[in-house]
Amino acid sequence: MMLRALKMPTIGRHAEEVAQKAEREGWTFGQYLRHLVSLEVEERRRRRIERHQRESNLPGEKTLATLNRKRLPPPVSRQLATLCEGGFVERGENVLLFGLPGRGKTHVACAIGHELVRRGRRVLFTPTYALVQRLLGAKRELRLEKELAELDGFDAVILDDIGYVQQSRDEMEVLFTFLAERYERKSVLITSNLVFSEWNRIFKDPMTTAAAIDRLIHHAVILEMTGGSVRAERAEETIKEARATTTTTATTTTTVAATTTATSEDQLGEM
């Protein structure tokens, strides 16, 4: 009862079991207590990571394990392990991923995000347009400051496809406000199909565009995702597999038909 009140349920569940082990192995009371506390700490860590994973909205399939590292540009491949360690988050730095559609920008950003969560960080993945609408709604309801404070609780926010956002002035302003609020304090990971020279299509106003870029690149790691389209290559592989399956099926059907014909002829001959 007291352990539940103290919010230490893991110790309560394992106390008797660990006591028996301690008696068998001749532990001191200090060893017994340290072991119980370590179980409680580990269980809390596990639950915290599960909670952070749920709230992150990270696509479950875009992890480091499913990332084809052989396809990554060498500079990206060299920096990936360091980024996954999360040092850039501690320094409030940003990660900017540029490249044409289908080059794996989102997968790399999400893989980094999953690793950060695994290391105890709070991460939020969101399409840029969704974040903009969220902030715009908060502004209309006069709670933008509260919404920004809530987002400030995340160690890293992944803004996916910033290049697809064609904003009104109000939308541009809330996005700029969000980026300015996190400047030099909290990390942002951004994927974009547009190079910086084309960002005037996002922010419209040249001065706002320059100010946004300046804040993002001041402390940033820039990853250029070159090479072929991952999606196009996967589509080509799927087509090849479908053709191979069709060919195999056709061959099997022909063989079965030939066997059936031969059997029928043999039976007629016997008659």
What are the language-model segments listed below?
Residues 75-153, 200-202:
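Conserved P-loop
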Residues 37-87, 229-242:
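AAA+ P-loop ATPase motor domain of ring mechanoenzymes
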Residues 4, 8-60:
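Interdomain "pre-motor" coupling segment immediately N-terminal to P-loop NTPase/helicase cores
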Residues 156:
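Walker B motif beta-strand of ABC-family P-loop ATPases
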Residues 1, 17-21, 66, 94-98, ...:
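Short hinge/gating elements
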Residues 1-4, 13-16, 34, 65, ...:
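Solvent-exposed alpha-helical segments within well-ordered globular domains of core cellular machineries
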